[in-house]
UniProtKB/Swiss-Prot annotation:
Pfam families: RRM_1 (PF00076). GO terms for molecular function: RNA cap binding. One of its GO terms (biological process) is nuclear-transcribed mRNA catabolic process. It is found in: Nucleus; Cytoplasm. A motif (Nuclear localization signal) lies at residues 201-207, 254-257. This is Nuclear cap-binding protein subunit 2. Keywords: Cytoplasm, mRNA processing, mRNA splicing, Nucleus, Phosphoprotein, RNA-binding, RNA-mediated gene silencing. It comes from Arabidopsis thaliana (Mouse-ear cress). Expressed in all tissues analyzed, including roots, stems, leaves and flowers. Coiled coil: none annotated.
Amino acid sequence: MASLFKEQAKLSAYRDRRFSGTQEEFDEALRASTTVYIGNVSFYTTEEQLYELFSRAGEIKKIIMGLDKNTKTPCGFCFVLFYSREDTEDAVKYISGTILDDRPIRVDFDWGFQEGRQWGRGRSGGQVRDEYRTDYDPARGGYGKLVQKELEAQRQLVDYGTGSLGAYPQAAPTNYGNGRRGGGNYGQGGQNRHGRGDYHRKRQRDDDRYGRDNSRRNTDHESRRDTDSDMRPEKNPRFRESGDSDDDGEDDRKRRS
């Protein structure tokens, strides 16, 4: 009986729930299969890497990568189909536990690939083991899916709380007039905040008024100067003022003498 359990442990470390037969039929399928299941694979391991590694055990018929059923990207497992049973046994014997992309891969006998088994069975699309994993594994998407959802929910709560406080700007104080309790300046503090601006605005109004007054005075002065010039009588060339001398004056003095 002990040898039977030992033989079972050698054939496979897990039982596929999708196998519809009995345990005896499952064990018989494992003994005759030329397919191996590879687990604990990095999401970034390529089909070419797997082919290079498993071709050392024998001639490979086909490699089928396990994919996330939602994103259609590798999700950490694959199937390798050999042509002979001997090569299949060598792969399990010599390659299981090999370090590939800095992680030990697991190689088990498989009862045979069927269409649909290439998709992950987890609720999030990947493998079930990655749903409940609590450790951080950068080669397999970081934390497990449930932990990622919890972290995302916490982040959204933090973002929502920050947004509710910072999304709406604080309303500026309204000027209700200069009442006895501070009025529009909200008391002494309001004067400290707004008094400087009021001073500059008043100074600017005074400067503008002073400039307009100067301009008006200059304009009035020029107008009065022009008016005085216009009102001053023009000299008649026929009349002379005292002290003037010309030839007609000399003629008068000659006649008197």
